[in-house]
């Protein structure tokens, strides 16, 4: 009897560990992403207010020092025209970032890309982006800040370890097959974004791009849990509640008509609701 009990207990432990492994695999370890840093810098140089925060001054001063000579680069001029004519800003910028690969190529099928990106302008933008990367020595800048990036990730890890992805499954009564990513954005102040992309393996990848707006006595970014955790929970909730937005389009349009002005000030158009 003792032997049977021991076997059953061992099986229960193994099953629990398997469940934990499956849920933990939903949540990817936080990182600083060079695609996000590059696009943030580009739209800082265009003059977009939301990408011109200096809350993490230790880092943004380095950006200004390195990239100021390129404010009139042909890419920046082209990007300014996209801001003016198509409203490329806020989360549209981050949508482009996560759709790129690590060589800054855009896949042939980029259906997840935000609709504010004019499909006729995407090719020229990518071509100029690659030229900007080379001309501005972006890779050298990124590598020179790797210690800062690693320290930021280290400071974020306690929050990452406290996230219980199984809670979502239990609360909503359904399992999401999405993969959740946390990207630490170093220059965007309190700007936080939640873009998503479906990859070639048909896995839906949900991103929480977290800004940096609180620093310690020496100017290094910190991540107070009481500020950060609610934002993460909010962003990842979308994966469970945004299954069929068309069901609510009519009522959403009626509500938006009453509050549209206030929502627009928060960079939320009807499509974001």
Go through the PLM ranges and name each one:
Residues 194-226:
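Active-site scaffold of zinc-dependent metalloenzymes
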Residues 75-167:
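Long, mid-chain structured domain cores
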Residues 1-25:
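Bacterial Sec-dependent N-terminal signal peptides
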Residues 22-103:
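N-terminal mature-domain "stem" immediately C-terminal to a signal peptide or N-terminal signal-anchor/transmembrane
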Residues 145-204:
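Auxiliary, metal-adjacent structural segments of Zn-dependent hydrolase domains
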Residues 271-273:
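Conserved small/polar residues in nucleotide/adenosyl-binding loops
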């Amino acid at each position: 009897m003792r032997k049977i009990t021991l076997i059953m207990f061992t099986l229960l432990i193994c099953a629990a560990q398997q469940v934990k492994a499956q849920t933990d695999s939903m949540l990817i370890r936080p990182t600083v992403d060079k695609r996000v840093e590059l696009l943030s810098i580009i739209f800082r140089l265009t003059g977009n207010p939301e990408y011109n925060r200096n809350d993490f001054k230790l880092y943004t001063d380095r950006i200004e020092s390195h990239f100021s000579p390129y404010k009139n680069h042909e890419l920046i001029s082209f990007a300014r025209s996209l801001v003016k004519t198509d409203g490329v800003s806020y989360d549209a910028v981050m949508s482009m970032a996560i759709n790129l690969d690590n060589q800054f190529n855009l896949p042939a099928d980029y259906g997840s890309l935000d609709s504010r990106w004019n499909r006729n302008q995407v090719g020229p933008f990518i071509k100029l982006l690659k030229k900007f990367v080379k001309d501005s020595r972006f890779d050298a800048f990124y590598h020179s800040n790797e210690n800062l990036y690693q320290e930021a990730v280290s400071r974020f890890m306690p929050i990452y370890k406290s996230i219980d992805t199984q809670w979502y499954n239990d609360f909503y009564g359904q399992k999401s097959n999405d993969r959740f990513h946390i990207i630490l954005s170093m220059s965007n102040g309190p700007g936080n974004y939640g873009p998503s992309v479906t990859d070639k393996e048909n896995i839906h990848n949900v991103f929480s791009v977290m800004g940096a707006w609180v620093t310690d006595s020496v100017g290094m970014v910190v991540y107070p849990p009481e500020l950060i955790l609610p934002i993460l929970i909010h962003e990842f909730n979308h994966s469970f509640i945004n299954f069929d937005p068309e069901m609510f389009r009519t009522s959403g349009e009626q509500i938006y008509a009453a509050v549209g002005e206030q929502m627009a000030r928060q960079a939320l158009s009807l499509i974001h609701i």
